[in-house]
């Protein structure tokens, strides 16, 4: 963390002491029986500790240390990203939040989102999300997803040939990001040229970090870098949008070929079409959601398969049975995906131990009582995946890697939440499943590997990532399966 950044936080905190005093008196006067907890420093609250625990590799510490302190309560108060927050933990809390979407709570994003996605200031980030959810079902329905599988397989093959084959050592995380970003560009924008894809792929790391950061727009801060990166990507997207408009008018592009064409040609309920900034921001959000979480999952699949040879052997056996059933040049299809039951159990266990989505915020629409505590209107609520994923009451021996947890009906409801839950469950969950399984198929049938840094630190910012990118030594199989067309 840059020295001037820390100094800036301290200075801002000092200037906010009077505001904190007035706020404390106002809250006390209202007489709420609030959850136990503390609000931390003025303005920044406990944001630094909340974020720094992730940077240091143990994001669950912020949650579990407070749960232990306020036991048996499963809810505590804090202040994060400039907001008063009730952190709600456990399956019962998850059920309450997911079941009361649109009734007692609504989705909420930090104010930093409005800076990075400026079109959302015209309405609100919540309204923008609603619009997106109306646009997405066509592209994530089963028949559409089935059509994507051969395309995903083709891109995975090309990615392996370009980035993995012929190399003895690689860093997994950057390559996983290239794979998932290439897929998102191909399926959302019909961009298939790796050079074009690479042109605006790099800034996405800064965008994701900026979204969940302390919203201080000073040079060098994560928030400032996120804003700058989003502007770079947005300009590139506007160029793509202008060209697509020309291609559609000249019949060089299809109205149904991808999400971009759909956005350009579909009016809202009032007959109005989205402008270029609206479309650029929505595509930007899709590209972030469409590749960031899946790339983290793919990376940790590689990590755990390197650490657990018996798990690797089970995945290898399943994937080789599928590979050997294919004709030369034949791509994966829906039936093949349905056979990858053990592989998906492994991926699910990976996402239990390293959830790509660490948690999410809601906003209280009105005052309500929960577990004997008053939650005031306007307060933010935060649910944490780790509060159940690493809870022995939900998953016995939670640190043990056990894909069998997902056999049969799987974990109890509201305990396994890597994609959220309720009406706000990630609409791209099935899309993510496909890109993860296609990745597993293509890497396992080509290689075994070993980690080059046995105890590499895992950082969370905002998703879990290996601090050094997960360098591995590749060991190609002696008799690789033919994959060329």
From Swiss-Prot:
Q: What is its EC number?
A: 1.14.14.126
Per UniProt, its applied use is:
Soapwort saponins possess anticancer properties and are also being explored as enhancers for endosomal escape in targeted tumor therapies. They may also serve as precursors for vaccine adjuvants.
Sorted alphabetically, the keyword list is: Glycoprotein, Heme, Iron, Membrane, Metal-binding, Monooxygenase, Oxidoreductase, Signal-anchor, Transmembrane, Transmembrane helix
The glycosylation sites annotated in the UniProt record are: 25, 386
| Any GO MF annotation of the entry | heme binding
> What is the annotated tissue distribution of the protein whose record heads this document?
Mainly expressed in flowers and flower buds, to a lesser extent in young leaves and, at low levels, in old leaves, stems and roots.
Q: Where in the cell is it found?
A: Membrane
Coarse class of the primary localization is: membrane
Which of this chain's residues are annotated to bind heme?
Answer: 426
Q: Which GO terms describe its cellular component?
A: membrane
Spell out the reaction equation it catalyses.
beta-amyrin + 3 reduced [NADPH--hemoprotein reductase] + 3 O2 = oleanolate + 3 oxidized [NADPH--hemoprotein reductase] + 4 H2O + 4 H(+)
Q: State the Gene3D superfamilies in the record.
A: Cytochrome P450
**Record-level GO BP terms:** saponin biosynthetic process; sterol metabolic process; triterpenoid biosynthetic process
Query: Which residues does UniProt call coiled coil?
Result: none
> Which cofactors go with this protein?
heme
The biological pathway it contributes to is:
Secondary metabolite biosynthesis; terpenoid biosynthesis
Q: Summarize the protein's role.
A: Component of the oleanane-type triterpene saponins (e.g. saponarioside A and saponarioside B) biosynthetic pathway, leading to the production of natural products with detergent properties used as traditional sources of soap.
Family classification: Belongs to the cytochrome P450 family.
- Name of the featured protein: Beta-amyrin 28-monooxygenase CYP716A378
